[in-house]
Every structure is written in structure tokens, then in C-alpha cells.
Amino acid sequence: MDYKHFKGKHANIVIEIISLLEKGVKKAQEILEKPDAGSYTKLENSSGDTPIKADLALDKFLEENFLSLENIKSVFSEEKETPVTKENGSYLIAYDPLDGSSVMEANFLVGTIIGIYEKDYKAQNLVASLYVVFGHKIELMVALEEVYRYAFYQNKFHFIETIVLENKGKIVASGGNQKDFSLGLKKALEGFFAENYRLRYSGSMVADVHHVLIKKGGMFSYPQKKLRKLFEVFPLALIIEKAKGEAFYFDKGVKKRLLEQSVESYHEKSECYLASPHEAQILEKHLKGE
């Protein structure tokens, strides 16, 4: 893989993790392709969800590999109650081993989300993030100074493009139970569809955000507090912001940056809006004051 795009203080750890992922893609594919990979276990993870077999197998594989990196001090999976910590190292990893596992049996796009933190698990300490999506193609998205898209081919990740969101998109991925949507959100969505926006919600957050990114604009929303800050929300928020979009939530009707949220507990959840600038403006107009 060509690492010429990665510069700055945190470039080396990003390169190390990508190199690790590049070597591990085939093993991950094997895990996902097993006939019973989508079968539910009888366990319950720290977030109260029932993991599928592929969740646990990928988690074990990733944890072992992340801990093998000398500069990693702590590794934290959403499947675990607390982080696994070493004596040495500078960086901390929080990851969702298999985002979208609930739709895997339908053969929808799933992925691994990774946040790289420094010193402590806080939004302000998130220095880079990335995800890998598994479908008929395998792609990697990396946020450091900018956002870079890669495709896996012949055992390597190949650079495709630098992602920059346009001011306005044409797709909407609105997750959650619509009967619980606020009046403001319902009006915003009605306005988008009146402008011929297309609904592109799959039930896999990483897939839906990936769609917004490769289409260069649009909006992903999940207004209920269901998504985990450290493992899903913060890493994808960083990618959206580095792509010149906006990542936010509403606190008593006031729009605020997701990456300025505090974290009171490891598995704390948040509402989440990820959008290009025009869609962010429309959402604020309708949800302000609610």
C-alpha cells in the first residue's frame, strides 16, 4: 500500500494499523463467510446486545493483533466491559468489530470501525479513525488530516480518492423508530423527500455513512440514544468532519458538535447526525428549540 498521504504526528500508528488490517483481511473474510457466521450466540455483550458468532470471532482476532503493536497501550472492544491495557504504549484503540451484524444474515454490507485515541478515551483525544467495509468489494476509509478511500485488491489496499463532501447531497439514511421521531425531524425529512432525496437506510451504520461519503453528500441520522460514543459515533464523526461535513447532536434544542461531548461511562450512547453542510443547516432549522 502507498502511504504517501499520511503525514504528521500520528501518521506512523495509522500506517501500522492499516498494515495489520491489510494482512488480516483474508482471515476476516474467512470468519464472515462461515455458514453459521450470522448465528446468534447465547451471550449478552456489555451494551446489552446479543452478539453473533462472527462478532466474537472477529473481536478475538482483532484484539490479539492490536495488542501485538508496540505503540498500543490499550485495546477496547464494544463487546467487552472494560479495556485491555498494557504497561507500555501511547495510543488507545476503541473498535466495533462487526458493525451491522444484525443485517448480516440478509447479506448486507457490514464493517469494522476503529477509533485511535491518545492518553484517554475522550472525544477530544481522538486523533484518527478508520473503517473497513465488507461487501462484494472490500474498502477502507481513513481519517487523519483528510479522508482517504482505498479498495482491497490482490492482497493490498489501493488508493481511490480523497473524499470531500459537497455542500448538498441527495441521499438520506434516517435510522430509528419513525413513530418516535420529533415533529422537527419529521418536517426536515419531508422537506428532503420533497426535493427528491432518496432514502438509503440499511440498518448498518457503517454502510450508510459509507454511502453518504462515496456519494459526496447527504445525511445519516439516528435520533434515539442507541449508538455507542467511543466505538461508533466518535470515529465516524471524525471521518465526516475531516471530509468537510458536520457531526452533531441536539441538547435541549441546541445543535452541538459530537466531538465535544463528554464521556461519563465507557459504553455511553448518543443520538447522532452526520451530514453535509446544507443538510446540517436544514436539520438545525427544524430541530432548533425542540
UniProtKB/Swiss-Prot annotation:
Its main location: cytoplasm. One of its GO terms (molecular function) is fructose 1,6-bisphosphate 1-phosphatase activity. Pathway: Carbohydrate biosynthesis; gluconeogenesis. InterPro entries: FBPase_C_dom, FBPase_class-1, FBPase_N, SBPase. Substrate binds at D99, G100, S101, S102, Y201, K226. Mg(2+) 1 binds at E78, D96, L98. Its EC number is 3.1.3.11. It catalyses: beta-D-fructose 1,6-bisphosphate + H2O = beta-D-fructose 6-phosphate + phosphate. The keyword Protein biosynthesis does not apply. This is Fructose-1,6-bisphosphatase class 1. It comes from Helicobacter pylori (strain HPAG1). The gene is fbp.
